[in-house]
Amino acid sequence: MNFRVGLGFDIHELIAGTTIKLAGVSIPSNKMIKAHSDGDIIYHSLADAILGALSKGDIGMHFPDSDLKNKNLDSGKILSHAYSLMTNNKYIINNIDITLILEEPKIKKYKDNM
């Protein structure tokens, strides 16, 4: 059996806003994530881990911020792209652990939808 391990990491500045998107869920907040795409750091980290495990670079290679079509891009599309590369190469995910370091907003009531 062939195992591959990927490690994804994402960090962004928080700025004034109304919503933070995490794992596809929009969470009301007085801040937002400053990013070229929608800034979903959970989807970005997971996509980056998949791409890394496949030795396919990172999300910046696949979705450069210099390309205007990626402006405000739904990060679900980034994750779907990485997942498609994984399944097309006949790999599966065995285990995922995501650590979110964020003081606010509190996400407890949103976790089940994430």
Kindly give the residue locations of the regions a language model identified:
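Glycine-rich anion/phosphate-binding loops
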Residues: G39-D40, N72-K77, K108-D112
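Short acidic, Gly/Ser-rich segments with clustered Asp/Glu that frequently serve as metal-coordination loops
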Residues: H12-L14, L51
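Glycine- and Gly-Pro-enriched alpha-helical subdomains that act as flexible
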Residues: I50-N95, E103-E104
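Short alpha-helix carrying the canonical HExxH Zn2+-binding catalytic motif
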Residues: G39-I50
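Short amphipathic
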Residues: F3-D10
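Histidine-centered active-site/metal-ligand motif
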Residues: H12, H36, H44, H62
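Active-site microenvironment for binding and transforming phosphate-containing groups
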Residues: V5, A16-G24, S29, T87-N113
